[in-house]
Amino acid sequence: METPGERYDYVIVGGGSAGCVLAHRLSARAACRVALVEAGDDTPPGAVPSEILDSYPMPVFCGNRWIWPDLAATATRDAPPRVYEQGRVMGGGSSINVQSANRGLPRDYDGWAEEGAQGWSWEDVLPYFRKLERDLDFPGHASHGADGPVAIRRIQPPDWPPFCHAFAQGLRRQGLAALKDQNAEFGDGYFPAAFSNENDRRVSSATAYLDAATRARPNLRIFSNTRVRRIVMEGNAARGVVAVDGSGRELRLLAGETVVCAGALQSPVLLMRAGIGDATALAQLGIASAVHLPGVGRHLQDHPTLTFCHFLAPRWRMPLERRRASMLAARLSSGVQGSEPSDLYLSSATRAAWHALGNRLGLFFLWCNRPYSRGRVELLTADPDTAPRVSLNLLDDDRDAARLMAGVRLLAGIVSAMGLSDDDQDFFPAAFSPRVKALSRFGRANARLTSMLGALLDAPAPLRRALIGRFFNGGRRMSGLLGDESALAAFVRRNVFGVWHASGTCRMGNAKDPYAVTDIEGRVHGTQALRVVDASLMPRLPSANTNIPTIMIAEKIADAMGRSAASRTPTAQPVYVDNQGDDDVH
């Protein structure tokens, strides 16, 4: 049964990293009616699930409750599809990710401006990075904010466990400099990783922006467990959305402006189902074209990534009751001819999983910054219940494969210099496979199984090697990969995966660019009253995790939308004021 249409000034589709920001900022104007529609559970103050609040994210990430379970992606053209974890919960990815608060490098945003997104250079975006954050370590620094909604902190060297000190030693012995602040000191080096966390608790976009005061605003309505089925179009104009709530009731939400914040995989899908995309491809699915924009769903990017583990003797392990496991990261240069400096990122974790087995394994994540390869999101059918085809096409550009191979060699040298073990077989490649993910799901059965497997890892080396070969690396040895170029190339292509930084599928740019989807304020080219505001807009994936850059994008566009609304209503309007950095940035 469909309810009569409810009218709002803005309907925001998706309560993720960007949507929560927009709900908070746009509803600050009391005369502005705002609806926020999220497909997953709400996480209101005082009722945030403990798994989401936890500083250690893997139990929530490896479960199915707060992700889109039917959303899958192929990593390369030859790879089978596998689940691609994207948040379906208030806060979106910021509620399930590793909490990294990485901005990237100035060149990333200067490149956006050069590619047609004028007004998005480093100088232009820095005020919004400052606006969003409350940096607990650098509150008075010119590059940092002191009163924004998102708390950001680092774990400093005096509080590092032995594994982190060993990692720092390995990086230092390979010639890398020690940096204090990855978000203000640029170039190669290692540093305490910044993350969105306070008092050892996650700070998601929902926690930061949808606080009790914001939720109490009478002009803001939040719909959770409500999935948008389609954008309502009249010609080229968006008039709102049709959604279905958890009880199966159909809702029609009318909007002066519809703002799509569903993420880089879901936002292009909503546009295409509304007839906005490649007209020929849509016609083949029986979808009438509203606006021909062939760039919708194209230009998909993610960081090509590999994982490695190292068996840890007892003196290198961290107590399980200490939750935060990732504390130290580094930027490196591959040295591949024609590549940019700082084109690799390396992070570590003192445990590979929440259980006794994972506590015996140190983890390394290696990825390529600013990948050259491009993928695509495509509709398979007009049915809104059918997931799209997601092709990451990682390593399609050989330059990405060459850089990742160089990164493996660099990592091997770093690990050798760490001094963790005399047995070189204790360091091994370990793909984040469906088997590993299944073993990482939180539960009593896995706790019992991993406790037994963990005890076996402490057995003599031959038994440990057999166990590692069966469960983690298929018998591959690092020495075999490093000594055989073709074996290393095959390993990289077989095991590469995305690190859940999907972006670029509705990229912003000049209207004369046939593959640009929006203008520099997220307004969809050729349409009226329709925007996209999320990681879809990124012209090129920055040298960073995507959460903080996405929040920055939302802050910047919310500011522009607020100024536009104010110019249409010149008489004084009441504005809700709080202590979350609500002043406009000019």
Regions found by a protein language model. Give the residues of each.
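N-terminal redox-cofactor-binding region of secreted/periplasmic oxidoreductases
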Residues: 1-586
